[in-house]
Amino acid sequence: VNKRVLLVEVDNWSLMAGKKISQEAGTAALQDLPAEIATAVRFLLQKIEADHRGGTVELRVPPFGAVQCIEGMNHRRGTPPNVVELTPEVFIALCKGEITPVESMQKPGCSFSGEKADLAFGVFPLLGV
């Protein structure tokens, strides 16, 4: 099976392929979550990637996207050593400050692996969303 991965470099560093989501579009998506959950998640991941550059932790929100964040080590190939995987609903609630990182650890469908995975909790909540 021949698989190809597309990585686009935006502002010298980006793991998310595709067009940047504007502040207006991201904010509108957050206000209309049922219809726009994919755009809302991608917008929030984009903000985390821009504000918390690095490669120590991979933050995944399947099926919508994943970014590497937090300064420190850089991971380039294979399974990352520190992974946080959240459901879209839990991810958005964390970003908006509606739940705490500790509460997110108890939610079904969320997983945390690696000794530095907890560093990702420092990005929540996101200001201005």
Residue map of PLM features:
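Short, charged/polar surface micro-motifs in flexible loops or helix N-caps
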Residues: 64-67, 73-75
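Surface loops and adjacent helix of pleckstrin homology
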Residues: 71-72, 115
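Active-site regions of enzymes building and remodeling cell-envelope glycoconjugates
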Residues: 72-83
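Short connector loops at helix/strand junctions that flank enzyme active sites
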Residues: 52-56, 79, 86-87
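Solvent-exposed beta-strand sheet faces enriched in polar/charged residues
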Residues: 60-62, 113
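N-terminal amphipathic/basic helix or basic patch
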Residues: 21, 28, 32-39, 43
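A glycine-rich beta-turn/hairpin centered on an aromatic-Pro dipeptide
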Residues: 36-58
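C-terminal interaction segments
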Residues: 2, 6-30, 81-129
